[in-house]
């Protein structure tokens, strides 16, 4: 018989490790296993090895609510974040529950047994593995680890230099003294450009359109002062609350006063780079937070541009040549190395196949329940963080909600929990998975994602304060979550 666990957590990255820590703290008698397809924990922070890899938000909010970030830098480099995750896993004894080289391919739900059968492959020997569980908690991330987005780059096969994608950075790439073109304008490109500019002959960031940027120090003076005066846990709690409040206020201002926010953001860039560069390369056509803002720690990209070691070109590619790229303006960029920072390939939960009682699940046909579960899919939750704040702020909330749910089911003697549309919900209009967020990587996958409705709880909210109250305090018997015991309906 397949091995059984109360909970199977898929993914040992930032979300999965956090989920296991919460489960162990709040549901200590539940058996669980973490299935991880890679050879190590860390997810994004183990996968990405490109120069300068770092967080794009502060670690007092990207860190777990239960584990203080106790370093001088609040904008942290990738290795420091990976070390933090390892510490969290070891301190909470969840590392012993991880099974590496177990790539989950799908899962099948049986209402008769009230169990998921999880289908995985052992990536070392290729052997199929089956496990069963009562609850499936998906924390496998939101993008494909195997296939990044393949942007159309005409004639790239003609290029005789080196082409690198940030998702698969070679350890032995020597770019010292080389001419580098980084294609892209997102967080990855803006991280790589100043990092490579320190050694390369010159780095050009080639973008089709500009992105909003904001510079801030990589050290939080208030946080570091509090750490000198107070215990780490208290100092962290105060700093975290401060930063969450400021993030919420800033996001609210950008949405309610977009023109004013736009002028403030562009004004800050003008002070660093002047009008000509700002107007040509840092003035987006959309409003702030229609797409995610890019963070520049200590204004590192500004410094690289001012020094002449880096530059920005806003144009479209006509074709690659053996020695570079010809643009629509007829300009040509010569390059020894091209970095294609053109984006991630988003996927529905973990690129996996699911079925409920033999019927395949098409997530595009479902409605999202509070942004964490799916209509008519029992005993499953999936983590997707905030697009306007640190990912972990939401993954912590979702993990705590799942623990609440599991304890509620234990207390009521139920073993199945399924979000189902009420009669009054059946004519709801379908709205996109996330409202008002327009980057290409999101738009490319939106048609395959669950829909929002026009009323709670069929929403995917992006506001931490309101969602914290809902997920941690709102009644679970909300008329949507249907709790049953196998072969017997229970009214809760």
Report each predicted region and the residues it spans:
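Short FAD-binding loop at a beta-strand-to-alpha-helix junction that anchors the flavin cofactor
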Residues: 62-64, 162-163, 371-388
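Beta1-alpha1 glycine-rich phosphate/pyrophosphate-binding loop at the start
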Residues: 5, 9-10, 14-98, 207-208, ...
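Core beta-strand elements of the Rossmann-like FAD/NAD(P) dinucleotide-binding domain
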Residues: 3-5, 124-135, 175-176, 328-337
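Rossmann-like dinucleotide-binding core of oxidoreductases
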Residues: 2-4, 8-9, 14, 19, ...
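Short beta-strand to alpha-helix junction loop
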Residues: 69-87, 99, 183, 253-261, ...
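C-terminal active-site-capping segments
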Residues: 396, 400-492
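Feature captures the FAD/FMN-dependent oxidoreductase FAD-binding
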Residues: 72-144, 272, 319
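Alpha/beta-hydrolase fold catalytic core
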Residues: 263, 267, 271-334
């Amino acid at each position: 018989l397949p091995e059984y666990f109360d909970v199977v957590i898929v993914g040992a990255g930032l979300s999965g490790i956090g989920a296991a820590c919460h489960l162990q703290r709040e549901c200590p008698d539940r058996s669980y296993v973490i299935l991880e397809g890679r050879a190590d924990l860390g997810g994004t922070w183990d996968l990405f090895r490109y120069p300068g890899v770092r967080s794009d938000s502060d670690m007092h909010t990207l860190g777990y609510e239960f584990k203080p970030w106790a370093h001088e830098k609040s904008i942290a480099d990738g290795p420091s974040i990976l070390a933090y995750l390892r510490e969290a896993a070891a301190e909470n004894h969840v590392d012993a529950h991880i099974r590496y080289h177990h790539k989950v391919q799908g899962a099948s739900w049986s209402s008769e047994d009230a169990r998921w059968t999880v289908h995985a492959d052992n990536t070392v020997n290729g052997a199929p593995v089956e496990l069963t569980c009562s609850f499936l908690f998906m924390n496998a991330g939101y993008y494909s680890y195997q296939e990044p987005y393949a942007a159309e780059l005409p004639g790239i096969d003609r290029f005789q230099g080196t082409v690198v994608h940030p998702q698969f950075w070679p350890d032995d790439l020597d770019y010292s003294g080389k001419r580098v073109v980084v294609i892209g304008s997102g967080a990855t490109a803006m991280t790589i450009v100043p990092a490579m500019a320190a050694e390369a002959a010159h780095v050009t960031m080639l973008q089709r359109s500009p992105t909003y940027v904001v510079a801030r120090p990589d050290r939080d003076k208030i946080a570091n002062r509090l750490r000198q005066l107070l215990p780490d846990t208290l100092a962290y709690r105060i700093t975290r609350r401060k930063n969450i409040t400021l993030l919420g206020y800033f996001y609210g201002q950008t949405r309610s006063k977009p023109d004013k926010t736009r002028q403030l953001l562009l004004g800050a860039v003008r002070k660093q780079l002047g009008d000509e560069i700002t107007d040509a390369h840092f003035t987006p056509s959309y409003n702030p937070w229609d797409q995610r803002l890019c963070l520049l720690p200590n204004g590192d990209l500004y410094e690289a541009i001012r020094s002449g070691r880096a530059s920005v070109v806003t144009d479209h590619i006509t074709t690659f040549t053996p020695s570079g790229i010809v643009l629509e303006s007829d300009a040509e960029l010569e390059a020894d190395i091209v970095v294609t920072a053109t984006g991630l390939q988003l996927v529905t939960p973990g690129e996996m196949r699911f079925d409920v009682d033999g019927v395949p699940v098409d997530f595009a046909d479902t409605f999202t329940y509070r942004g964490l579960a799916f209509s008519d899919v029992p005993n499953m939750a999936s983590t997707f963080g905030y697009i306007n704040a640190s990912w972990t702020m939401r993954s912590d909330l979702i993990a705590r909600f799942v623990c609440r749910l599991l304890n509620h089911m234990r207390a009521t003697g139920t073993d199945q929990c399924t979000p189902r549309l009420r009669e009054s919900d059946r004519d709801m209009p379908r709205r996109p998975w996330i409202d008002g967020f327009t980057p290409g990587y999101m738009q490319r996958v939106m048609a395959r994602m669950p829909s929002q409705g026009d009323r709670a709880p069929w929403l995917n909210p992006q506001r931490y304060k309101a969602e914290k109250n809902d997920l941690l305090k709102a009644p679970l018997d909300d008329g949507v979550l249907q709790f049953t015991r196998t072969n017997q309906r229970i009214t809760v």
